[in-house]
Amino acid sequence: MKVKVLVAAHKQFPMPADPVYMPVLVGAVKNYKAGIAYQRDDEGDNISAKNPYYSELTGVYWAWKNLKDVDAIGLVHYRRYFYVSKPHDLDHVAKGVDYEHFLADHDVIVPKKRNYYIESNYDHYVHAHPAEPLDKTREII
C-alpha cells in the first residue's frame, strides 16, 4: 500500500524525516517565500487562492487532483502528528510502516477524542475565519 501523509504548513518548520510525509505549503499563492522547498499547493490543478477560506484543505485538494499512484492520502498539521510513543517529538511520529499497519485493518485513522469545553465550535471557527459564510450556512439549513 502506498501512503502519503501531507504535512500542511504555511511557513518553514522542522518536518519528520520519514518519506511517508510530504510537506505541502498551503496557500502558496500568498505564503511562498524564497527558500521554502515544500510541495506548493498552487501548482497543477489547485485552489491555493482559496486558502483563507479552506485552510489546510487546499493542500488536500492539490493532492486529490495531482498525486498519482497513491493508495491512501493523510493530512496532519505541521505541529500536530500521530505519535507511536512518548515523548511527542519528531523522533516518535508514526512512520510509513505504522500507517500501513493501521490501514490494514481500518479505513480511517483519527486522533483520540478531545473534550473541548472552553468555547463552541462556532466561536472557535469565527476566531480564525469570517463569520459570514458560517452564518449564511446556518440560515440556509
Regions found by a protein language model. Give the residues of each.
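ER/Golgi luminal nucleotide-sugar-dependent glycosyltransferases, focusing on the catalytic module
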Residues: 1-141
